[in-house]
């Protein structure tokens, strides 16, 4: 996910995206704790996507 794609979305769409990413992160954490997560690098990418979405939301709030 690129920041340029996120800047085109509305705040409501960004909040929906953020909620989905947080759910995905929770599910991945549960899988990692039980040893079922094969690709552990996906946790890092989801965490960074969450940060990107939050950054764009804060930028839009400041405008």
UniProtKB/Swiss-Prot annotation:
Organism: Pseudoalteromonas translucida (strain TAC 125)
InterPro entries in UniProt: Ribosomal_protein_uL29 (IPR050063), Ribosomal_uL29 (IPR001854), Ribosomal_uL29_CS (IPR018254), Ribosomal_uL29_sf (IPR036049)
GO annotation, cellular component aspect: cytosolic large ribosomal subunit
Alphabetical GO biological process terms: translation
Keywords per UniProt: Ribonucleoprotein, Ribosomal protein
GO molecular function, one term: structural constituent of ribosome
Name used for this protein in its record: Large ribosomal subunit protein uL29
Keyword Ribonucleoprotein on entry: yes
Gene expressing this chain: rpmC
Family: Belongs to the universal ribosomal protein uL29 family.
